[in-house]
Amino acid sequence: MGMQMKNFKKMMTLMALCLSVAITTSGYATTLPDIPEPLKNGTGAIDNNGVIYVGLGTAGTSWYKIDLKKQHKDWERIKSFPGGAREQSVSVFLNDELYVFGGVGKKNSESPLQVYSDVYKYSPVKNTWQKVDTISPVGLTGHTGVKLNETMVLITGGVNEHIFDKYFIDIAAAAADESEKNKVIYNYFNKPAKDYFFNKIVFIYNAKENTWKNAGELPDAGTAGSSSVMENNFLMLINGELKPGLRTDVIYRAMWDNDKLTWLKNSQLPPSPGEQQQEGLAGAFSGYSHGVLLVGGGANFPGAKQNYTNGKFYSHEGINKKWRDEVYGLVNGHWQYMGKMKQPLGYGVSVSYGDEVFLIGGENAKGKPVSSVTSFTMRDGNLLIK
């Protein structure tokens, strides 16, 4: 997508009791083949029949599926997405159809990057896509979503559409003038978190009625690039950015009951071994295995939090982004460091099936997309990584 996409990718990278770790044998976990093409900043979901669907991001308009119940598991290409290439969409299965919400991309080769508020759905039976006659109440990029039931999805977080779009309009206007471009970049990043107006409203979309509902607000500031999971009517909203380059280590917890969201006591991710504080993560993988919430990977800027505390709003200036390989687990109500992944990785797709958490694609420590598929499983108190 040219220079604007390069600036977008650069900017978005600024915006996703120790237990033993073991490499599993084939008897412990499912082995899945690599995705046909590398995937980062994509999206994915699993249906009620154990079929995983992933696509978009660096895969462009391509989508693939794999049936976990088949003896011989292979990725199959499905019909391409009609809404154009985009990154950071959210997808869930509702009423046996795959819904895709928002994202960021270019409407044509000449236009600047922009936030989308559209919704598409895919029918596995017909292998067809359809644009849904609705738009989200706010533009959706950097948002997160979890399925509440067969008809409803909860969506929250994300960047402010107008502020985000204006940044790329200004970058495009600067064109080849490096001095002007650097000025735009500095002015964009050198602001306090509150000035970015990240979305803190919680929206509920009902696919059966094709309606949106305001379900309240996050208990604190809005975030972008958070990870989220839902288990037994309890929502966990994990870390994310408070502003580009600055993460939070907070995990919000809420209960969904009688169509109402009640916020409970939050918690914090512990520091990594050898580090004084937890910077927080964006683009992390997450999912449950045998009742343990596992969070791994993602990326941050070590030292940005201290800079911000000291009054430096451009908190990540001069700091190299660090992709993470640590895995944490919420065991008996307490967060613990569990061990390390096979490699630092973030901004991929997390999908849970049974007691396995699949980590599909992602971005490695060189900023490159990968096509690998790995998994987390808890067994006998150990974290198994395959």
Curated annotation (Swiss-Prot):
Record: active site: E241
Coiled coil: none
Entry's EC annotation: 5.1.3.24
Primary residence: periplasm
Molecular function terms from GO: racemase and epimerase activity, acting on carbohydrates and derivatives
Annotated signal peptide: 1-29
This protein's UniProt keywords: Carbohydrate metabolism, Isomerase, Kelch repeat, Periplasm, Repeat, Signal
Cell location: Periplasm
Keyword field contains Transit peptide: no
GO cellular component: periplasmic space
Substrates-to-products reaction catalysed: N-acetyl-alpha-neuraminate = N-acetyl-beta-neuraminate
Enzyme class (EC, first level): isomerase
Repeat region (Kelch), residues: 51-95, 97-149, 151-186, 187-232, 235-284, 306-355, 357-386
InterPro entries xrefs: Kelch-typ_b-propeller, NANM, NanM_proteobact
Keyword rRNA-binding: no
Binding partners and assembly: Homodimer.
Job of this protein: Converts alpha-N-acetylneuranimic acid (Neu5Ac) to the beta-anomer, accelerating the equilibrium between the alpha- and beta-anomers. Probably facilitates sialidase-negative bacteria to compete successfully for limited amounts of extracellular Neu5Ac, which is likely taken up in the beta-anomer. In addition, the rapid removal of sialic acid from solution might be advantageous to the bacterium to damp down host responses.
Family, per entry: Belongs to the NanM family.
Protein name per the record: N-acetylneuraminate epimerase
Organism (species): Salmonella paratyphi B (strain ATCC BAA-1250 / SPB7)
Lineage: Bacteria, Pseudomonadati, Pseudomonadota, Gammaproteobacteria, Enterobacterales
